[in-house]
Amino acid sequence: MEWARLIAGLAHYSGDVGLAEELAQDAVVAALEQWPEDGVPRNPGAWLMTVAKRRAIDLFRRNRELERKYAQIGRDLDTAGAGGTSDFDQVVSDDIDDDLLRLIFTACHPVLAVPARVALTLRLLGGLTTAEIARAYLVPEPTIAQRIVRAKKTLAKAHVKFETPDSQQRPARMSSVLEVIYLIFNEGYSATAGEDWMRPALCHEALRLGRVLAQLAPAEPEVHGLQALMEIQASRIPARTGPAGEPVLLLDQDRARWDRLLINRGLAALSRAEELGGARGPYALQAAIAACHARAFRPEDTDWARITELYAILAKAMPSPVVELNRAVAVSMAFGPQAGLDLVDQLAAEPALRSYHLLSSVRGDLLMKLGRAAEARAEFERASELTRNGPERQLTAMRARCAEANVHIDISGWSPKRIPPEVIRELRGRLNGQFLWGSDYPFLAPERCLSELSDLGLPADALQTVLHDNAARILGLNR
């Protein structure tokens, strides 16, 4: 965060974010040249600020219109001393946190397009290089560089002041800040495109920014709501991929791998949001939904009825077809797949979801649970075509293959007494298909059959579907 503090302090004095970054870069270059020979100063931050301000004086001397700023910075240098050893907070400002908050609001100013806000935030507040940002978003480096340059020019042309918004503008401006931070987190959590299911570095950067913002704006309930949401979602990152990097869906995850420390931090942040009266803000509501999952040590312990209620409230606070789709999933888990499918079918005509791969994926999942395998396969194939993420494409393609009706589990030569108890329990429950029985295949031991089935790496719902379509008739079960 030292980089952001340096830029924030310089922007406070110069009133120009672009110039502040240039001054900070010059100071860092000077440090790289001098510190190896002279040693690292006792207070590196103060040293960098002093060098940057001296560079600013050189620039301001060439421009009489900036004489006032020159005098102000000169007075600060006199106070700080030539050695630059004064306390960093005193060199920058009596309240550096205010400068950081101003920098956040400036980088996320609504005058900028959303992609520009994201790039500028990662550059100025995250300290990421243009190359790092480009790699994270699969965009050519020159594109990111130009995006940042244009953003700075736009701020200057619009005469955006380096300040926090007034009370009337603050809610809308804070909403813009939260949106940018969550966009960064989401791109890391579920990558839009490319061959990575996740990009954890973006998640961690967004989470860090969220924590800083919660310290800078402690009275804002939705700030704590966003922090809570990101903490809880980030807790699942270790369990969201398998050994080969393949996606692992929520209900299939090993919950023992969830980070309980992050969950506890998220629950604490959610409590702060609720104490501040923000329990029904969009981010706090999403955090409350995430908390329902976090509190369930097993998938079957999940309070789906409560999640359904929370999604209904969220749909009113933040109307969106995507929210309605998520609500349909919760309804299906609470009240059965047909209830969920009825809601999903109502969303099919939504223009915003026409090319949304998760609509087809959810519909395919519900159709599979209803035994409509052929229709489900078509939906999974469509989802596979629509997604731009490689691992997600492989996942939906595999689910499409698993929907084929000719997938069987061969138990030739088995006695019913030798069928594993786990399988019998499933067959006596919701599985009512058939195993392949009496074929020409050689005898397969139950242990080997189950081992080979497990090695396929099928998601839990796909495994249930295979069993559903191929349950053993010898057990007296009818489809």
PLM regions and their residue ranges:
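Hydrophobic-face residues of short alpha-helical interaction/recognition segments
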Residues: 6, 10, 48, 52-60
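Amphipathic helix-loop-helix modules that constitute alpha-helical solenoid scaffolds
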Residues: 63, 71-115, 123-130, 139-312
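A short, charge-rich alpha-helical start-of-domain segment used by transcription regulators
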Residues: 1-8, 18-21, 171-179
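Structural recognition of an alpha-helix C-terminal capping motif at a helix-to-coil junction
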Residues: 22-29, 42-54
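Mid-to-C-terminal alpha-helical segments outside catalytic/metal-binding sites
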Residues: 398, 431-434, 444-479
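Short, charged helix-capping/linker segments at alpha-helix termini
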Residues: 7-24, 34-43, 141-142, 192-196
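Catalytic pocket-lining loop regions of alpha/beta-barrel enzymes
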Residues: 378, 397-436
